[in-house]
């Protein structure tokens, strides 16, 4: 669709990808990276605009999986620097998420304590900065 729009002269310079995913079902990070690359080859800028990773019954093991999913999604963006120019979570704390506290989708819990996902995102960014 975007390729066709560009071919018809539609003035489009970028696309936002919503990433509302779950620890029980998330996209392959290599497929996400490939999609970002493909969009870049069309001359489009990409932004991941709404990242959250639902985690119902989020015990320690599931929080670690949630952290891994966040890290892989962010890495897919960072691996396409110059194309993927933004990575945003769809909120800050599980207390105020549009999905409800019970699915704990964000980087901070309902008490604003940092979750493993926060530290994974930080580590991924720090590794890129090295």
Q: What do the PLM-derived regions correspond to, one by one?
A:
Residues 1-10, 16:
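Active-site cradle of extracellular carbohydrate-active enzymes
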């Amino acid at each position: 669709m975007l390729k066709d729009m560009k071919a018809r002269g539609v003035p489009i310079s970028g696309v936002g990808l919503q990433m509302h995913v779950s620890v029980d079902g998330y996209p392959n990070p290599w497929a996400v990276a490939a999609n970002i690359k493909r969009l870049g080859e069309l001359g489009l800028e990409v932004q991941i605009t709404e990242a959250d990773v639902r985690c119902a019954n989020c015990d320690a093991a599931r929080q670690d999986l949630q952290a891994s999913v966040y890290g892989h999604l962010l890495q897919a963006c960072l691996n396409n620097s110059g194309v993927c120019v933004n990575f945003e979570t769809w909120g800050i704390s599980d207390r105020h998420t549009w999905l409800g506290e019970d699915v704990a989708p964000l980087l901070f819990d309902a008490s604003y304590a940092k979750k493993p996902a926060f530290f994974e995102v930080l580590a991924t960014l720090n590794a890129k900065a090295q």
